[in-house]
């Protein structure tokens, strides 16, 4: 049974957009529950991207011929679509290769611009993906700023109390950099409360998991920077975006140097191009950016509110059904802040074995491992009632999933438990 957001006819059209859902894996219908790692790709988006490459492609911004003009127009139109999608200005949107590049570029630029310097404090949470953890840790060792943490409880949940405790320990952080939604626990963070609590800090949001299913308004949230990836919202790999308030982007040193990002170059000095081009050195992933624009068109044609409600419905069902299994330990909150994914373990069975059996015997794609969040695994181990293996199984849904997919997962987990005793 699909989400009640779609009629049977509408859902049939959705399934037709993703041909891989019609294939079999090990003799079973594919049940794709690894959307937090990457989503499936839309036939419409791929078709339009192919047409762009075959009939309209050229390098951009550099020539006056027709193909260059067409390609540049498509590229800049995609930027405008991204800006509209998050309620920003187009000059505040910088194309990147994805969230990891966006955060790394931003961290390096903040440090090199002197906006984060020796003696400053950067506040992040204990549930961060390595992409929002490692850059801060490493650069703090070279530039002398401190990294402090909003602590998670033993379920991996960031609570209001933990945010307030961090406020009492770190009264005036220069930067607060936090995920919008944990890729391990599925918790959607209270961004508004964090903004209100740390009014004067530069607020950076890792939107990789959140933006595929929840509308983000950067102006309403008053975030300073937002990064996200296209491949987690059915766009191709290798494309993402960095949003920054124009007043802050103007102050930042570019993170890449080369062609197109300059205004004037002499043998002695350089002046930079205007926003956002001073951050887009060299030839960009033109086709990827254009495809990201097509992706936004497709998602908006479905109604993003419908997608959001669909994910909420599937998430609730996933959490409810897994909670009925007494041999399954679930991590993260058990309320409505738990969205789109669930990380869990089967008592007595290693996560890799669980995922392998689900794939081989049921055609279910899940993720097992530490999910690029090794420090969080040590937090979860403290509160675990089982012999915690420093990794988990993760099942994650998107709008093309069904309740039947979740039912098959539950049956698969019962089989796993019987098989391993």
Model regions and ranges:
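Pyridoxal 5′-phosphate
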Residues: 1-421
